[in-house]
Structures are given as structure tokens and as C-alpha cells.
């Protein structure tokens, strides 16, 4: 509990946050060009995918101590003293302007006007609790090959919730989409490996027979991407292959160095140490992954989740009386040790003798809360591998394998994939890229669907219905503080929209909102809007207190938060192609991003 030294007491005490992962010390990530968007060509190994790669990584929150304006206002937080007992630390409360600056410093908003692309706009933001932040994110737009009969972009949005370091999430933000693109390229070219997954695979069988007698096999089926199970299989294969590369990289490097006779010298740091750490750290740290892939040509949205980040969609439902509500659709399910389906899956993959130990206290082997993750090799390597790598590479303090580590792997990166047909409930006319101003009534919101992707730092404090209601009310023009019930009136009951009975709508941490007007509508960026309201919303003092606590103390009260909100409408008929059609909305001049080749 926070002890107030303010001239007036805090409105409500703040709950301590229970970390999901044991903390680990890690060096800061390499310098990045903050707030800069890069466009570069991406090659996929085939002709079916070409075009531009657009990404933006998370900015790091390094500046935690800004001077207060005027007379400082102080409060105290409990800390563990060096003697092992409890003590307190006095902190300075951020001013209102400093709080706003902290909330907004990483936000970005983009308007999209690309031909045959249903994305109207997307807003992003991240807020660090760890230092450096362990979350990351990306946005990627790929163009189909110009010769393809199917027109429309392939759009990827990803959020990555790292733990025990930032290295794995950073690798996912730069590599995962490339792995998925390579698998999709095989699907688009009708590869036999995916054609064989068709319900009637006679075409692939005849192709094999034809190949045996001729050198010119028939043209592969070019329509494999019509089949959702095949697209899901491609995404799953990409996730698994990237994770295998991450986990096996240190093992391959050790074999290579042993053959070359150049193992790191334990008494001095050299090139070999640097090379070893670059392979070892992404494998030792871990990350959840949430990837939304929008296939504009097929008008479908594929959402893949590994871990416990969440995706939720709001769908506008007119009531025929000049109004309507936003229907809540959960697009993911938390993969944690408290999910009965995940517990049953893990138990089925190990001997019955381990049934009581594979998941204990809601954690894999009593340690890891998410049951699926990239990296986390201490739950995947064969027994003895970690000790061998530590002896050869001398990485410093590294936790050993968990207890009852008998039949690895215990954790997988293979995702669950949900597919949504966006042609259902098609909207009316598409808005122009400049029509994102508030509307005066809910009769004509500027988008008829939106998707929210976020790491669990957001869902710790807001449930799915609250998130859809907050975005939906914002799109319907609400701009004044609201009670919770008032905000929830903008959405329909989500109970029937849940993909399972495993509480996908419940925040993991009981919020401390209090009564009255608890939600605020003061931010133009929808991701910032959600982040602010997750921390207290209209309870301004609570928001300031939470943001005034520096790392690592802040980790006891809140997690890193990364959020992307995507507005969807009718695909544009006359939008731009090539490298055009993506505009910064929140930074003048209002010009498209330029390619950097």
C-alpha cells in the first residue's frame, strides 16, 4: 500500500502487482532510432510476395527522473531494506504535464489509404515499467506480386511481451513476420507441402505421379490460401521454425566454435563472448507473441497467439432505430497455467508420473506463467544442455533448469490461430483518410470494426468489454468523463462472444477504480486512451502516482504495456499502391511515409 505525504490523501490505495516472471538483469538493448519508421524491401524466396516492409519498434523509456514544477509533492512506497526488513522510499509526484508527456511520448497514429486495403487507421503506444522495456511491437505491410490475380495487401500487426529480458521480444519484432511471409509464399505458390493438407489431396498425388514420368509437373493449385486450415498451418509452422532457430542457435554456435577451436576465454571478454551472448540471450529470455495478419485480398483476419497477450474486436451493430452498440468478440484465449485446457494439453504431452508436477501453482514446473512462449530455453533444452552452454560461454549468473525437469520440452511456441471473415457485416461506404473526427451520434461511427492488440499489462486492469466500450464510445464522439456503467452501455453483452469458458473477459488484477466518473476521454490516440484508463483514467492522481514510481519499483504495481488499435472499414477502391498510402496523422506535415531503399 502506498503511504501518502500529499496535502490530501490518495483517493484509493494501489494494489501491488504480482510479477509473472522472475526478474533478471540484462544489459540495455542496442541503440535504435526512436520514433523513426523504416521502409525496406523484403525478399521471401519466391515470386508470390514482393514489396515493402514497414515496421516501427517500441521506443525505450530511459528517462525516469524529471524535475517537478514548483513545490514538489511527495509520497512513499514500501521497499525491501538491505537488512531484509521493510522500509520506505520517498518519491516525487509527477505534475499533470509530466504525466501527460510520459503517457504520450511513444504514441503514434497513422491513416491508411491503400487500394483494396480495409485498414483505415491504426494507433500505437507503449509505456515502460521495466527499464529497459521488455515489450516490443511491429507493423508490416506487404504487397502481393503484381502478376497475382488476387489484389490487396498483406498487413501484419504484432505485439510481443518479453520476460526475463528484452532480447527475445526484440528478435520477434524484427524476424517473425519474415518467417510467416516465407511460409505464406509457399502457400501462394501452391507448394506440395501445403497442397497435401487439402481435404482431397488427389491433386498433389497426381502431381507426384506426373513428376515421376515427366519433367514438367502440372501447375500447382494457386488457390490454397482460400482454405483457412492451410493458412493456419503456415502461420503455425513459421512460429515453430523461428522458435527452433532461437532455441538451437547457442547449440549450433557451440558446435561450430568447438570445431574451430575458439571457445571464449573465461578470464577476459572477447569477440567470442559477444558472439555467444548474441545467440544465448534471446534463447534464455522469453516472449509471448500476438500477431494479427490481415489478408486484404481474401478479406480475412488471422490472429495467432503464443502466450497471454490478447486480441479483441469490436463490431458495430445497428439497432435499426438510429443507434447501435459495439459487439465484443474475443479473438484469443490466454495460454497460462490457470487455463484448464492448457494444463490438460501439457499433461497429455508428458508421462502420467509427471501429472502433478508439469503445472504447479498455475505455472509450468512452478516457474513460468505463460504455457506457450518463444525462447525460455531452460524449459525446452535437453537435460544437461544448459549446463554445457554455461560452462563453455560463461554468461554470468544464469538460473539452472527448473525442478522436476525430466522430459522436455515443457513449453511450446506453436500458436492457436483464429480466423475472422471480414466480408460478414460489411460496412457501408468507406470514409476518407481525413474523416476521423468525432461524430455527434453513434449512428455513423468512423469505422465499423476495430481490433485491439495488447500485452497483458493492459488486460491486467481492463477486461475485454471495457476495452471495446472505451474505444467504441470514443469513436461515437464521447469526450467527457464517464462512469463505468455509462461506458459499458456502448457495447453488447460479450458473454456469448467468448471462444471458451475460460474467463477471457476478466482482468487478471482487481482494478481500484472507485465510484463515479472513472473513465476519461481526453486522448486522441486510441492506444493512449486505453493505457491512461487502465491506470486510473479520470482518477488523475492515481495515474500520476503510478507513473511516478521508477523502475524497478514500478514493476510491483504495473507491467509494461504495449497496445495497437486498428480501425477497419470497406476496402478502398481508389487508394494508393506501392510505398504510398500510409500517413502520420499526429505529426505535421500530413504526408505519406517515404520508402527507404
Language-model regions, residue ranges each:
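PP2C/PPM-type serine/threonine phosphatase catalytic domain
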Residues: 2-597
Amino acid at each position: 500500500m502506498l503511504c501518502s505525504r500529499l496535502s490530501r490523501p490518495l483517493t484509493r490505495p494501489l494494489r501491488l502487482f504480482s510479477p509473472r516472471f522472475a526478474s533478471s538483469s540484462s544489459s540495455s538493448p542496442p541503440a535504435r532510432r526512436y520514433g523513426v519508421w523504416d521502409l525496406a524491401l523484403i525478399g521471401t524466396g519466391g515470386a508470390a510476395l514482393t514489396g515493402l516492409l514497414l515496421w516501427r519498434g517500441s521506443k525505450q523509456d530511459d528517462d525516469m527522473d524529471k524535475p517537478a514544477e514548483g513545490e514538489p509533492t511527495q509520497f512513499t512506497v514500501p521497499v525491501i531494506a538491505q537488512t531484509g526488513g521493510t522500509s520506505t522510499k520517498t518519491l516525487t509526484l509527477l505534475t499533470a504535464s509530466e504525466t501527460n508527456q510520459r503517457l504520450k511520448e511513444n504514441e503514434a497514429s497513422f491513416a491508411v489509404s491503400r487500394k483494396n486495403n480495409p485498414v483505415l487507421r491504426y494507433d500505437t503506444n507503449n509505456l515502460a515499467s521495466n527499464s529497459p522495456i521488455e515489450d516490443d511491437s511491429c507493423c508490416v505491410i506487404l504487397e502481393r506480386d503484381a502478376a497475382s490475380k488476387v489484389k490487396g495487401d498483406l498487413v501484419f500487426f504484432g505485439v510481443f511481451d518479453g520476460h526475463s529480458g528484452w532480447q527475445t521480444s526484440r528478435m520477434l519484432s524484427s524476424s517473425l513476420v519474415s518467417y510467416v511471409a516465407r511460409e505464406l509464399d509457399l502457400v501462394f505458390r501452391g507448394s506440395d507441402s501445403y497442397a497435401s493438407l487439402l481435404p482431397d489431396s488427389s491433386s498433389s498425388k497426381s502431381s507426384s505421379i506426373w513428376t515421376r514420368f515427366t519433367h514438367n509437373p502440372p501447375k500447382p493449385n494457386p488457390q490454397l490460401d482460400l482454405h483457412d486450415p492451410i493458412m493456419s498451418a503456415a502461420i503455425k509452422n513459421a512460429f515453430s521454425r523461428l522458435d527452433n532457430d532461437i532455441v538451437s542457435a547457442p547449440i549450433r554456435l557451440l558446435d561450430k566454435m568447438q570445431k574451430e577451436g575458439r571457445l571464449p576465454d573465461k578470464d577476459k571478454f572477447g569477440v567470442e563472448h559477444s558472439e555467444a551472448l548474441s545467440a544465448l540471450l534471446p534463447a534464455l529470455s522469453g516472449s509471448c507473441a500476438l500477431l494479427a495478419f490481415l489478408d486484404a485480398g481474401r478479406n480475412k483476419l488471422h490472429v495467432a497467439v503464443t502466450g497471454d497477450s490478447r486480441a479483441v474486436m469490436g463490431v458495430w451493430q445497428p439497432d435499426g432505430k438510429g443507434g447501435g452498440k459495439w459487439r465484443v468478440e474475443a479473438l484469443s484465449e490466454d495460454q497460462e497455467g490457470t487455463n484448464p485446457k492448457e494444463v490438460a494439453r501439457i499433461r497429455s504431452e508428458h508421462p502420467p508420473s509427471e501429472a502433478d508436477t508439469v503445472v504447479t501453482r498455475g505455472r509450468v514446473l512452478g516457474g513460468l506463467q505463460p504455457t506457450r512462449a518463444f525462447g525460455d530455453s531452460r524449459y525446452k533444452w535437453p537435460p544437461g544442455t544448459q549446463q554445457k552452454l554455461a560452462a563453455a560461454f560463461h554468461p554470468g549468473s544464469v538460473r539452472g533448469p527448473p525442478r522436476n525437469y525430466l522430459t522436455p520440452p515443457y513449453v511450446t511456441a506453436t500458436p492457436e490461430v483464429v480466423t475472422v471473415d471480414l466480408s460478414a457485416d460489411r460496412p457501408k461506404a468507406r470514409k476518407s483518410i481525413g474523416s476521423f473526427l468525432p461524430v455527434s451520434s453513434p449512428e455513423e461511427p468512423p469505422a465499423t470494426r476495430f481490433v485491439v492488440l495488447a500485452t497483458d499489462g493492459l488486460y491486467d486492469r481492463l477486461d475485454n468489454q471495457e476495452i471495446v466500450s472505451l474505444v467504441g464510445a470514443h469513436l461515437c464522439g464521447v469526450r467527457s468523463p464517464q462512469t463505468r456503467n455509462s461506458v459499458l452501455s456502448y457495447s453488447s453483452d460479450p458473454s456469448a462472444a467468448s471462444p471458451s469458458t475460460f474467463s477471457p473477459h476478466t482482468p487478471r488484477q482487481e482494478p481500484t477504480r472507485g465510484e463515479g466518473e472513472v473513465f476519461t476521454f481526453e486522448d486522441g490516440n486510441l492506444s493512449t486512451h486505453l493505457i491512461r484508463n487502465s491506470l486510473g483514467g479520470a482518477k488523475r492522481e492515481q495515474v500520476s502516482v503510478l507513473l511516478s514510481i521508477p523502475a524497478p519499483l514500478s514493476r510491483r504495481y504495473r507491467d509494461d504495456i504495449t497496445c495497437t488499435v486498428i480501425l477497419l472499414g470497406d476496402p478502398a477502391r481508389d487508394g494508393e499502391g506501392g510505398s504510398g498510402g500510409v500517413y502520420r496523422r499526429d505529426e505535421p506535415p500530413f504526408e505519406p511515409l517515404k520508402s527507404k531503399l
